[in-house]
């Protein structure tokens, strides 16, 4: 099966899709490319993908993020280049909420 989610504008819709992807990920592999913090926060593993140019050649770099890097990335997705302490706290809260949701899913499936 293939699931396709169109770009969502509303936070509530994004949260519902994130929860559905978390459910599906318990039995299938899910790869999600997103700019929505609600979806990104639900990831078990979070990668940052960047494209650049060097000496006339385009390159792509992929880096697995640790928790601190995830928080910074979610804060960046939320508010742009200028990251504040409040944005970092909000990102941490998103991750904690996602972890709580996934823990409840895991305990339900046992």
What are these regions (language model features)?
Residues 4-7, 11-110:
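C-terminal lobe/lid and adjacent interdomain/linker elements of RecA-like ASCE P-loop ATPase modules
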């Amino acid at each position: 099966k293939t699931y396709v989610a169109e770009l969502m504008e509303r936070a509530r819709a994004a949260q519902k899709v994130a929860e559905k992807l978390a459910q599906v990920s318990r039995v299938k592999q899910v790869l999600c490319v997103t700019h929505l913090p609600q979806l990104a926060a639900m990831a078990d593993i979070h990668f940052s993908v960047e494209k650049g140019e060097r000496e006339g050649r385009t390159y792509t770099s992929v880096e697995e993020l640790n928790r601190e890097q995830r928080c910074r990335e979610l804060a960046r997705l939320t508010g742009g280049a200028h990251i504040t302490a409040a944005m970092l706290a909000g990102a941490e809260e998103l991750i904690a909420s996602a972890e709580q949701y996934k823990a409840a899913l895991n305990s339900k499936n046992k």
